[in-house]
Amino acid sequence: MRVAITGAAGQLGRQLVAAFEADGHEVRGFSHDDLDITKPAALFDWDSDVVVNSAAWTDVDGCARDPERAMRINGEAAGAVSAVAAACNALIVQISTNEVFDGTLDRPYHEDDDPDPINAYGRSKLAGEIAVVAANSRHLIVRTAWLFGPGGTNFVTKILAAATHAANAGQPLRLVSDEIGNPTWTPDLAAAIVSLVTQDDRRSVVHVAGVPAVSRLGWAQVALEAADIRVDVDPVALATFERASTPPMRAVLAPSAGVAEMDWRPASVECARGLPAKPNA
């Protein structure tokens, strides 16, 4: 297949390019410099069978401060990319988020649960889902959560840096104990998307996220133990952090049936130790 990937220079986009190429597909990756997704006509130059839209504005606090820009990029532009894919008779794969849910259920969210976002980022991503579906009957919405990947900065590397600073200063490390989610290793997510795209019995909406669900505190503790960093930890409530955007407290995704289990813990350990973690087998 010929596969076009937007956001190809991003944390997930790089892994998508690698995963589709490893599976033998012809891939064209479009970075932000290559393609403004609010004006996606350049996609017509690449006659694709599949378009994966991983481009997004994921700065949740930025989205809260400028919801119109969030809606333009995450909502309207997603629909425009989907329309170009439809004109090329291509499948559109839209990457979405657990933040389309409000996080109030006492169980994980399934694909058929009603979205009800509580922040500007979630609202813009839900608008993107709706626009993608309206523009292209051949669509696959992939909801995921708490992405972290090799190279660059991610939750694990940020926690290790913060813990080292706190330990050197003789201060406790404050960690949120009541926000629960699914850490998701981007190589695992990319491999799952390749598998989903090549299936004959594709669904229209799937949840692809790491297991088991965990708090930010619990995730951090796995990384700290792996890196052998000793620091006093001060568990705090999400509400004590002043932020422009309020994340849902428990927007845990139930991975869809048939999606390979993706345990986030081995990758977190390897990432914390500075080793090249690989996708789950």
Identify the role of each PLM range:
Residues 1-21:
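N-terminal Rossmann NAD(P)H-binding glycine-rich loop of SDR-like oxidoreductase domains
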Residues 41-75:
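NAD(P)H-binding glycine-rich loop region in Rossmannoid oxidoreductase-like domains
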Residues 65, 72, 77-80, 100-142, ...:
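Catalytic helix-loop patch of NAD(P)-dependent Rossmann-fold dehydrogenases
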Residues 27-42:
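Adenosine-cofactor binding site in Rossmann-like domains, unifying the SAM/SAH pocket
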Residues 6, 30, 54-55, 92-98, ...:
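SDR active-site strand-loop-helix element
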Residues 130-181, 187-188:
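NAD(P)-dependent short-chain dehydrogenase/reductase
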Residues 171, 192, 199-243, 272-281:
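Mid/C-terminal beta-alpha module of Rossmann-like enzyme folds, strongest
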Residues 229-231, 246-281:
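C-terminal amphipathic/interface module of NAD(P)-dependent oxidoreductases
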